[in-house]
Amino acid sequence: MKERLPHEKGFHVSWDQIHRDSRALAWRLDGQGPDNGAWRAVVGITRGGLVPAMIVSRELDIRTVDTISVKSYNWQEQQPPSVIKAPQAELMGDGHGILIVDDLVDSGKTLELVRTLYPRAHFATVYAKPSGRPMVDTYITEVSQDTWIFFPWDMALQYVEPYRGRD
């Protein structure tokens, strides 16, 4: 059987879809924080987690927002993850009361690294693949491991020439 290219089994996510799914994630997390249901802060894993983190923080009215930047890909090649930018140490502690948000858990290597730094944080993603699912506490949609997710911030709308020639 011929191996598929990443785009051949693709899941295209629109801006509207990521917004709806991120709101659904917020609703699922509402009242689940350790401090009488509240979360102390939202930390987005850059870059993909920024949009979902912003939407979750807005929906849950969490005003303290920070980021952690983890590099685990060089173009489309996966590499060992490394932290490029960490959130404020005094905010994070061991992660208690912190909601860490990303767009997707794929292999789980990024979340595994972040979880070693903040073991008591709550990890939430919009989408989850089976290999990474054990690393996430809350997610909205599961997709198969061999599906490539196309996020709207990775895509560009462009003009396409009509099949029968020019306008």
Curated annotation (Swiss-Prot):
Which residues of the sequence carry a binding annotation for xanthine? Answer: D106, I149
Q: Which domain of life is it from?
A: Bacteria
Q: Which residues form a coiled coil?
A: none
Q: What is its EC number?
A: 2.4.2.-, 2.4.2.22
- Pathway(s): Purine metabolism; GMP biosynthesis via salvage pathway; GMP from guanine: step 1/1; Purine metabolism; XMP biosynthesis via salvage pathway; XMP from xanthine: step 1/1
UniProt GO cellular component terms: plasma membrane
Question: Cellular location of this protein?
Answer: Cell inner membrane
Q: Where does 5-phospho-alpha-D-ribose 1-diphosphate bind?
A: R47, G48, Q79, D102, D103, L104, V105, D106, S107, G108, K109, T110
- Primary location: membrane
Provide a GO biological process annotation: purine ribonucleoside salvage
Molecular function per GO:
guanine phosphoribosyltransferase activity; hypoxanthine phosphoribosyltransferase activity; magnesium ion binding; xanthine phosphoribosyltransferase activity
Query: Known catalysed reaction(s)?
Result: GMP + diphosphate = guanine + 5-phospho-alpha-D-ribose 1-diphosphate; XMP + diphosphate = xanthine + 5-phospho-alpha-D-ribose 1-diphosphate; IMP + diphosphate = hypoxanthine + 5-phospho-alpha-D-ribose 1-diphosphate
Leading EC class: transferase
Q: Which PANTHER family match?
A: XANTHINE PHOSPHORIBOSYLTRANSFERASE (PTHR39563), XANTHINE-GUANINE PHOSPHORIBOSYLTRANSFERASE (PTHR39563:SF1)
User: What family is this?
Assistant: Belongs to the purine/pyrimidine phosphoribosyltransferase family. XGPT subfamily.
Q: How does it assemble?
A: Homotetramer.
Q: What does this protein do?
A: Purine salvage pathway enzyme that catalyzes the transfer of the ribosyl-5-phosphate group from 5-phospho-alpha-D-ribose 1-diphosphate (PRPP) to the N9 position of the 6-oxopurines guanine and xanthine to form the corresponding ribonucleotides GMP (guanosine 5'-monophosphate) and XMP (xanthosine 5'-monophosphate), with the release of PPi. To a lesser extent, also acts on hypoxanthine.
- Under which name does UniProt file this protein? Xanthine-guanine phosphoribosyltransferase
Q: Which organism is it from?
A: Cereibacter sphaeroides (strain ATCC 17025 / ATH 2.4.3) (Rhodobacter sphaeroides)
